[in-house]
């Protein structure tokens, strides 16, 4: 009996490691340029009389290293919903009405692109992981996306709500476990974020809220994850070698988010960049010890760009060369902080710029890489990646 059970269990598992097989991204069409945003933001929220606060906000935007962001909320929508523009006005119903529809729709655009690149029928998708910090509903966004895409009713769904900015790592960790423990599994992973839950007017007494208004943008990213790829029809982009999560010491309350009648509020209560840079070396040592890697400039980097200060302090603390965080900085500049979707956008940017530069691998010509998610807790997700050779590269 026991040997038969062991054979069954072995047959249920994949032979090789999980790999990212395709990536797709999407944004709303409404682009907002950071240089113009302070004037727009204070006008649309009827806050132009707060001249000193507007100057502070301009400085925040100037230091953000963001060029543009995309937002579903247009001027027309905001004019129709004045409570969303006010500071701390009851507005959850209006916000929910937007996100329960628009979060799955934006997710669909990214998923369609990922499925197209993968090149297989969507009926082969066995699992769906959906992640958002933008609203909550039942049945969830995972159900809505299943219907929008026409996935099989028997697809195994997982819905992650309210995880925050580390969750791009969380979904990879979960997808890795699903792909490696279910032979033949093909996991569709989607992160979709819309700032309609967090947008609000300024207040002189809550500058941490203003920081979020300068940083956050909308976006959705989708990937297909599977083990034992078909060499004839599937092209792996990155292998998921290991995945771990940890809570940083003495970081309780560093980032808090609370869903209330006024929407989702974020509070930055401690030196977040300092806490991350102080602890990141240990995360790296724990993750790369089995591989014998100790030179952090010898690996490629995908780090959640919560803000420029996080990237700057990590770079200084580890003595990283400027180009190491180039892909992360590029996504921050072009899209802002899209919470859980950010690191998947950076994965896409990494493979794209590696190919365009004629690099030998999807990881800037290097073999090993790291993906970091940082968020409430403070929680850190650490994913060790292995790149794959780029066809035709010298």
From Swiss-Prot:
Keyword Ion transport listed: no
Gene Ontology biological process terms, A to Z: flavonoid biosynthetic process; polyketide biosynthetic process
EC number: 2.3.1.74
Homology family: Belongs to the thiolase-like superfamily. Chalcone/stilbene synthases family.
Catalysed reactions listed for this entry: (E)-4-coumaroyl-CoA + 3 malonyl-CoA + 3 H(+) = 2',4,4',6'-tetrahydroxychalcone + 3 CO2 + 4 CoA
Statement: the UniProt record of this protein carries the keyword Chaperone: no
Annotated active site: 165
This protein's encoding gene: CHS4
Transmembrane segments: none
Pathway annotation: Secondary metabolite biosynthesis; flavonoid biosynthesis
Pfam families recorded: Chal_sti_synt_C, Chal_sti_synt_N
GO MF, any single term: naringenin-chalcone synthase activity
Gene3D superfamilies, per the entry: 3.40.47.10
Keywords for the protein's UniProt record, in alphabetical order: Acyltransferase, Flavonoid biosynthesis, Transferase
Name of this protein: Chalcone synthase 4
UniProt xrefs under InterPro entries: Chalcone/stilbene_synt_C (IPR012328), Chalcone/stilbene_synt_N (IPR001099), Chalcone/stilbene_synthase_AS (IPR018088), Polyketide_synthase_type-III (IPR011141), Thiolase-like (IPR016039)
Annotated function: The primary product of this enzyme is 4,2',4',6'-tetrahydroxychalcone (also termed naringenin-chalcone or chalcone) which can under specific conditions spontaneously isomerize into naringenin.
PROSITE patterns cross-referenced by the UniProt entry: CHALCONE_SYNTH
């Amino acid at each position: 009996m026991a040997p038969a059970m062991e054979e069954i269990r072995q047959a249920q598992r994949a032979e090789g490691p999980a790999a990212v097989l395709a990536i797709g991204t999407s944004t709303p069409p409404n682009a907002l340029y950071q240089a113009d945003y302070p004037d727009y933001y204070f006008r649309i929220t009827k806050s132009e009389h707060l001249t000193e606060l507007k100057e502070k906000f301009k400085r925040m935007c100037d230091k953000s290293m963001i060029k543009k962001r995309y937002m579903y909320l247009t001027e027309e929508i905001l004019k129709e919903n004045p409570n969303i523009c006010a500071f701390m006005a009851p507005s959850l119903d209006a916000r929910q009405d937007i996100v329960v529809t628009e979060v799955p729709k934006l997710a669909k655009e990214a998923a369609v692109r990922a499925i197209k690149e993968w090149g297989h029928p969507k009926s082969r998708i066995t699992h769906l992981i959906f992640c958002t910090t933008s609203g909550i509903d039942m049945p969830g966004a995972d159900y809505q996306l299943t219907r929008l895409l026409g996935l099989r009713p028997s697809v195994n769904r997982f819905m992650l709500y309210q995880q925050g900015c580390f969750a791009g790592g969380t979904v990879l960790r979960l997808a890795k476990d699903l792909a490696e423990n279910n032979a033949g599994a093909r996991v569709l992973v989607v992160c979709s974020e819309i700032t309609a839950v967090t947008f609000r007017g300024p207040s002189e007494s809550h500058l941490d809220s203003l920081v979020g208004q300068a940083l956050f943008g909308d976006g959705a990213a989708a990937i297909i994850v599977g083990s034992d790829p078909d060499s004839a029809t599937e092209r792996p982009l990155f292998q998921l070698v290991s995945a771990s999560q940890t809570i940083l010491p003495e970081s309780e309350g560093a980032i808090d988010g609370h869903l209330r009648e006024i929407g989702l509020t974020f509070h930055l209560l401690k030196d977040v960049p300092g806490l991350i840079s102080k602890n990141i070396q240990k995360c790296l040592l724990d993750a790369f010890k089995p591989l014998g890697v100790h030179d952090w400039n010898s690996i490629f980097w995908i780090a959640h760009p919560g803000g420029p200060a996080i990237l700057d302090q990590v770079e200084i603390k580890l003595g990283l060369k400027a180009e190491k965080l180039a892909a992360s900085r590029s996504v921050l500049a072009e899209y802002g902080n899209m919470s859980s979707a950010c690191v998947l956008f950076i994965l896409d940017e990494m493979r794209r710029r590696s190919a365009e530069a004629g690099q030998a691998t999807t990881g800037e010509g290097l073999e090993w890489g790291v993906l970091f998610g940082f968020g409430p807790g403070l929680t850190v997700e650490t994913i060790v990646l292995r790149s794959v050779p780029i066809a035709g590269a010298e």
